[in-house]
């Protein structure tokens, strides 16, 4: 067990609550010690919804354990009386799992009808956020999905959208807009916004859409096996993947339409998918060929995240923006094999699989790519390294839970991603220009002395100033070589001054390459001459 700080995935409780908090009429009771209700604060801070999270805690105290009593039955009664949920999900925390309590027996003593209770007693030490969320949603589908007649006209279920999902509402809106353009109705969206009654009517749809590898795919596979419902698992990230996604959707829907004697759906003009209905649905195809974006073909990108977004973004960056992929990885080991298959031919080396952010930061520092697409962790790491970074998946912070329409799915999503790539890379150039033209008043002086007027100190005379200046310039310490921030090599002042003229977003890479060059020729100190030789040797 590792200390749970800066982990990519949350606990099993976090995954369970993502599903239950997404649904209507579903409440969660955690059998846990005081303090595990931090999850409630997480939702109220990050989730941009007016509803309060449907989460309660059955507190376990030392005195209760000593007396052999449990608060769980009483807590379940209070939840039933106050919230009147259709279903209450009961789950243990890591602490209470050690007690080996029979939660089914405790729940039975609550007096709440058993059909309104569900004990989801997984092992919180072995199961993390995404696996717990996917497992619970699949169990709910198995419990409530009921065989029934299909809808008269083509309809689909959209599965896997959960609370605290990355750009959740915008992605869902993007998919629904595409479906409306095609004339396909949405039967159920679950778990987001769904109810127990909605889960019951899942088999009425013609097709299931499960774009997330992490949550929803197993539920779609169960519905396909039990109710012969075809499923679409492709990820509509990027212009061409979205076109293929629409083609596959129509192919599956029309196959069922022919069997049911319904007229097939024709592919509408691409303009119909645009926001105004008059222009191309995405500006990426022409924007990627502009002079402004042409330079991106030489830029290197590193991508790290969950399975769905890592695969989608790697393909988008290389296929549609022409960037070079210097590496990619994931913190979800259970999906690594699927990712290797999807990214075959895209990566220069092996897929990185780790849940240690330090390992990812080390790779970024070694590669020093022009762009990193990752999580909130990589954003922190890249800030220290002065490497441009854009967040593409959880874990995220408040700035990635937006009120506005910023999808990653569909044609509109392709535009959003392209904009973010462009801005993330170009802002570095802007900062360098501000540094470069600092004398024009575009930056603040870092070590500006306090005002003489404000401090009440009289200005020194020119003679005194000149003496101080002369003594400073004569001091041997003033021109002494300064050690590198990394502590490996020593740089002279003139070499350091020349290095500062290099744009900040490649400065660390230039420093590292110069030091490697100096070691190679046996120079312990980097002077201006050594710096120039390194520049010539490296093709600068």
UniProtKB/Swiss-Prot annotation:
Substrate binds at residues 428-429. One of its GO terms (biological process) is light-independent bacteriochlorophyll biosynthetic process. [4Fe-4S] cluster binds at residue 36. Residues 457-481 have a biased composition (Low complexity). It comes from the Bacteria. One of its GO terms (molecular function) is metal ion binding. The keyword 4Fe-4S applies. Keywords: 4Fe-4S, ATP-binding, Bacteriochlorophyll biosynthesis, Chlorophyll biosynthesis, Iron, Iron-sulfur, Metal-binding, Nucleotide-binding, Oxidoreductase, Photosynthesis. Binds 1 [4Fe-4S] cluster per heterodimer. The cluster is bound at the heterodimer interface by residues from both subunits. Pathway: Porphyrin-containing compound metabolism; bacteriochlorophyll biosynthesis (light-independent). Its cofactor is [4Fe-4S] cluster. The keyword Hydrolase does not apply. The active site is at residue 292. SUPFAM superfamilies: Helical backbone' metal receptor (SSF53807). Pfam families: Oxidored_nitro, PCP_red. Residues 451-490 are annotated as: Disordered. Its EC number is 1.3.7.7. Protochlorophyllide reductase is composed of three subunits; BchL, BchN and BchB. Forms a heterotetramer of two BchB and two BchN subunits. Component of the dark-operative protochlorophyllide reductase (DPOR) that uses Mg-ATP and reduced ferredoxin to reduce ring D of protochlorophyllide (Pchlide) to form chlorophyllide a (Chlide). This reaction is light-independent. The NB-protein (BchN-BchB) is the catalytic component of the complex. This is Light-independent protochlorophyllide reductase subunit B.
